């Protein structure tokens, strides 16, 4: 700790007793060499007197005569830090000044108490993608103040930057997964999706020394590797392994909790020490065309039939994405009153935005869903290549992705099929007086067959 850092130590309070800030004069009187300031981890509920036993083997000297103080306030060696006012839990890192000068009372003076990163908090709410919330995905290591108030600062700028990088990397790939329809759980990844993940992490962290052929495996094979096996395949894969662990912890948390809850993962995610380069000034967008092309083409579901269980019909990894839901509504002839295509270029309009939001809420079991939340979720897509807002047109959005490549049908084809389906339904109603069910398969087959005959 430098003199300046010592001058900036915050005020603390122990059992109601305040200790004023260290002044420059007091620091001069207690000058110590860097060798006399050591770091030591200790459990917050362990008697603080055990600090001597922990330090004696390291310092190779007896500390029996040393009192234990916290910024010059004497502590009871038989009581824990928690019992003496440090309101946190788990293991903390102490910065201890060892004072053994002749003519001075020997003591172990705790200068800082640092809470290490032990938990990963996940905000599970795909309808509210806020950077502020996602910044807490990886808990920042914090300097603890003993009055339990707001005085929380990061350990250092470097530590803060790296924590932020990991949080951004987790959220960044979550966006990539949703944008490309990649399952959240790595165990369900295909070989191409594993390679896409490797390339994304390499670009995100400016890595150049990873051999892609070593991870030309499926997601199930990837997740079956333990840490030792992984490093045998990827000798410099600390960052890859840490990122994979974060993704897997996120999946575990999302499986255990309902949406829109903050959950804490009990087991720590080990961020393996590695040199994480600082973020580059410009954001690199990773677009893997091969991963897109590998998507399975799906026939459109054009119907108006009742859904037996709207809450259980899902997309990748058991979760339907918002863009998939909107596309489903756009291929439902009975939903044209609330949402419909506009032209043939992928534009669509929410004719009844609150009704669309209500339907989305029913699908996701979120009764409080409204258009404000839905539009916030749609804005999440704007920085990708899936959906954008059409400027100057209220409630009008556009699929900017290549739907033909994605699902096998263009927006124009989907629009035409839906209109034909609606017209045939009306014709049947006029002939029979009631609406007869028209299946999507039959309609699509008839339409395509007619095209071939022409």
UniProtKB/Swiss-Prot annotation:
Pfam families: Ets, GABP-alpha, SAM_PNT. GO terms for molecular function: chromatin binding; DNA-binding transcription activator activity, RNA polymerase II-specific; RNA polymerase II cis-regulatory region sequence-specific DNA binding; transcription cis-regulatory region binding. Residues 168-251 form the PNT domain. InterPro entries: Ets_dom (IPR000418), ETS_fam (IPR046328), GABP_asu_N (IPR024668), Pointed_dom (IPR003118), SAM/pointed_sf (IPR013761), TF_GA-bd_asu (IPR016312), Ubiquitin-like_domsf (IPR029071), WH-like_DNA-bd_sf (IPR036388). GO terms for biological process: blastocyst formation; in utero embryonic development; negative regulation of megakaryocyte differentiation; negative regulation of transcription by RNA polymerase II; positive regulation of transcription by RNA polymerase II; regulation of transcription by RNA polymerase II. Disulfide bonds: none annotated. It is found in: Nucleus. Ubiquitous. Keywords: DNA-binding, Nucleus, Phosphoprotein, Transcription, Transcription regulation. The modification Phosphoserine is found at residue 303. The keyword Nucleus applies. Residues 295-316 are annotated as: Disordered. GO terms for cellular component: chromatin; nucleoplasm; nucleus. Residues 320-400 bind DNA. Signal peptide: none annotated. Belongs to the ETS family. This is GA-binding protein alpha chain. It comes from Mus musculus (Mouse).
């Amino acid at each position: 700790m430098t003199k300046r850092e010592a001058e900036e130590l915050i005020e603390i309070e122990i059992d109601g007793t305040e200790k004023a800030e260290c002044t420059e004069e007091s620091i001069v009187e207690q000058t110590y060499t860097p060798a006399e300031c050591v770091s030591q981890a200790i459990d917050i509920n362990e008697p603080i007197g055990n600090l001597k036993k922990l330090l004696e083997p390291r310092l190779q000297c007896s500390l029996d005569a040393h009192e234990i103080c916290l910024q010059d306030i004497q502590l009871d060696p038989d009581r824990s830090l928690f019992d003496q006012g440090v309101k946190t839990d788990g293991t903390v890192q102490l910065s201890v000044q060892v004072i053994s000068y002749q003519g001075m009372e020997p003591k172990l003076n705790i200068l800082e108490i640092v809470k290490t990163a032990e938990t990963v908090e996940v905000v599970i709410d795909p309808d509210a993608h806020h950077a502020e919330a996602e910044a807490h995905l990886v808990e920042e290591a914090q300097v603890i103040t003993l009055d339990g108030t707001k005085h929380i600062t990061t350990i250092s700028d470097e530590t803060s930057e790296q924590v932020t990088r990991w949080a951004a990397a987790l959220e960044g790939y979550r966006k990539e997964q949703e944008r490309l329809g990649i399952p959240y759980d790595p165990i369900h990844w295909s070989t191409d999706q594993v390679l896409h993940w490797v390339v994304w992490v390499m670009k995100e962290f400016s890595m150049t020394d990873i051999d892609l052929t070593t991870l030309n495996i499926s997601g199930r094979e990837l997740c079956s590797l333990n840490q030792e096996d992984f490093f045998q395949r990827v000798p410099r894969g600390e960052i890859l392994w840490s990122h994979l662990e974060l993704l897997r912890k996120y999946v575990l948390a999302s499986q255990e909790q309902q949406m829109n809850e903050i959950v804490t993962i009990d087991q720590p995610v080990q961020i393996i020490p590695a040199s994480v380069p600082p973020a580059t000034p410009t954001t690199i967008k990773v677009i893997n065309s091969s991963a897109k092309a590998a998507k399975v083409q799906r026939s459109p579901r054009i119907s108006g039939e009742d859904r037996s269980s709207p809450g259980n019909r899902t997309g990748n990894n058991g979760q339907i994405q918002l863009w998939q839901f909107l596309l489903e509504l756009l291929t439902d002839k009975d939903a044209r009153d609330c949402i419909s295509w506009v032209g043939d270029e992928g534009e669509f309009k929410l004719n009844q935005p609150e009704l669309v939001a209500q339907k989305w809420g029913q699908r996701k079991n979120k009764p409080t869903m409204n258009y404000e939340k839905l539009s916030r979720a749609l804005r999440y897509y704007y920085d990708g290549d899936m959906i954008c807002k059409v400027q100057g047109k209220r409630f009008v959005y556009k699929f900017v992705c290549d739907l033909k490549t994605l699902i096998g049908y263009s927006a124009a084809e989907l629009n035409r099929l839906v209109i034909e389906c609606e017209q045939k339904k009306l014709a049947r109603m006029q002939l029979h007086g009631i609406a007869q069910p028209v299946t999507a398969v039959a309609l699509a087959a008839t339409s395509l067959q007619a095209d071939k005959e022409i």
